[in-house]
Swiss-Prot record:
Name of the protein this chain belongs to: Large ribosomal subunit protein uL5c
Family the UniProt entry places it in: Belongs to the universal ribosomal protein uL5 family.
Complex formation: Part of the 50S ribosomal subunit; contacts the 5S rRNA.
Function: Binds 5S rRNA, forms part of the central protuberance of the 50S subunit.
Organism of provenance: Cyanophora paradoxa
GO molecular function annotations of the record: rRNA binding; structural constituent of ribosome
Pfam families: Ribosomal_L5 (PF00281), Ribosomal_L5_C (PF00673)
Gene (UniProt): rpl5
Amino acid sequence: MVQRLKTVYEQEVIKQLMTRFQYKNIHEVPKLKKITVNRGLGEAAQNAKILEASVKEITEITGQKAIVTRAKKAIAGFKLRQDMPIGVMVTLRGDYMYAFLDRLINLSLPRIRDFRGITAKSFDGRGNYNLGLKEQLIFPEVDYDGIEQIRGMDISIVTTAKTDQEGLALLKSLGMPFAES
C-alpha cells in the first residue's frame, strides 16, 4: 500500500522544492531518510515491567517492534552497570516512516493541549529535526486505561537536507505544523 504522505512528496513537494531552491537535479531535493523514536527509562534497571510496557507501547505507536537499548558502560553515580537495560528505541524507514509521520502530523500533534504549532528552532544545523513529547496519550493507538505512568519520548526526523532552511521547507511542505515565530 502506497502511503499518502509519500505520494504527496513525490507529486507536489519535489516540484515545490526544485523551484524554490533552484535544484538542477531531482536527486538534490531533500527527502526523509529515517525517523527514530526513543524513550529513556532510568528506572527500567530496577523494574522489568516498566521496560516491557514501554516496548509494547512504542511498538503499538510506531507499528514496528521496538528494541531495548542497554548501557554501554557502568556509571556508579546512577547505580548503572554495563549492559543494563536503560531505554527503548525504534528506527523507522520506508513506508513505516511515512505512515508514522502522517499519523503524527494529522492525528497526534493536534491532540496536544494548548497546541499552537511546534517550534522551528529544534533543527540541528544539518537539516534534521528533533522533537520531544511529554506524554504518550496523544497517540490514538495508546489505551488510556492500559498505562501506569505518563512518559514522554524523543522523535528524531533525519533528512538529506544540507541546511536547516531546506529541512524546514521539506517538513513544512509535508504538513508539519510549525508555530509562527
